[in-house]
Amino acid sequence: MAKAKKKAPAKLSPLLRSAFEVLNHGLQHYFRSNTTKDMKFALLHVDQAIELLLKERVRVGGKSIHKPNNPKETISIWGAYEILTKELGVAVPEKPDLELLHEERNNIQHKYANPNSEDAAFHMKHAMSFIRRFVNSELKLD
């Protein structure tokens, strides 16, 4: 009888793995060129990565990422901030800069905005600073 292969234990949750995948895709766009198209997709993906990282911390904190009145939907980035700060006591001092990024994302998504490379550089600098800190201090990853 053949022995079944042992599967490696999951090192990252699917939510966290997805956050890193979309972050990687955003960074590929950012470093590929400084066209408005690449800046647009860089910011969309990096903002999504941040939202997923926040949701992962909510999950790790033992809270549901699903809306209480509609379990088919997950909480928004704003819902994640609220749970983190009010229920889990997690400080997010970078929130004002991350709010600007999310506003830029909304402008891209809903108003057809095209960010320039200077604005994208501002958002990427602050986003990456947050991600480095948050992944290390809140998600306990190197």
Roles of regions detected by a PLM:
Residues V22-H25, H45, L52, L100, ...:
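Amphipathic, well-ordered alpha-helical segments in soluble domains
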Residues M1-A42, L139-D142:
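Charged alpha-helical initiation segments
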Residues L54-E99, E103-E104, I131:
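Flexible secondary-structure boundary motifs
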Residues E21, F41-Q48, F122, H126:
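Amphipathic alpha-helical interaction segments
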Residues M39-R59:
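Short, hydrophobic, well-ordered secondary-structure elements
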Residues S33-K40, K63-P68, S117:
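Short, surface-exposed loop/turn segments at secondary-structure junctions
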Residues G26-N34, V60, I108, Y112-P115:
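Secondary-structure edge/capping motif, primarily at the C-terminal ends of alpha-helices
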Residues L12-R17, L88-D142:
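Charge-enriched, short contiguous segments at helix-coil
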